Amino acid sequence: MAGLDQVIDYIKNLNFSYEDVDYLRGLGLFSEDFLHYLSGFHFSGDIYAIPEGSVIFPREPLLKVVAPIMEAQLVETAILTILNHQCLIATKASRVVYAAQGDGIMEFGLRRAQGPDAGLYGARAAVIGGCVGTSNVLAGEMFDVPIMGTHAHSWIMTFKDEYTAFKEYARLYPDACTCLLYTSDAAD
């Protein structure tokens, strides 16, 4: 299970600003009573969930919302989006960590994530799934996740060959040196 912390933060801080309500009013789809309700919205329900980091199984309830139907409907999509994304990442990370048979696995998903927030919360979810750290510096700062990484592929392009680039990187970072093969020249 991953994402519960973000779900709780979302629900605690959910509100509709004057600008939000004014935009909705401009759509001409909603009654003034509903818009007035939104302008004073505060979630009053209860959330029950299994703890983050727990193993989850198919058809197992992860989270239960007990609230008036209107409130539950207003938070449903966000809850599903958050939990679906982070549980997916944590599950995949757990499988990779298991396959590594005790070797540490680092998370480097930011460049492939579907947006900065997905990269940020994906890094957190990967660590919940067992990764030992992340290349995402903001995730390290926000979630106290160990930071680790490698050089950029462009690092190698600034040298005459891979060997020279690796040697210089190892000189600069003797205690934290992990080198990447330059993918366009991997056969060399």
Per-range role (PLM):
Residues 1-25, 29:
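Intrinsically disordered, low-complexity, positively charged segments
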Residues 29, 35-44, 53-58, 62-184:
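Buried, small/hydrophobic-residue-enriched core segments of structured protein domains
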Residues 47:
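Structured beta-strand/loop patches that form or line metal/cofactor-binding pockets in enzymes
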Residues 188:
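Short, glycine/acidic-enriched loop or turn micro-motifs at the edges of active sites
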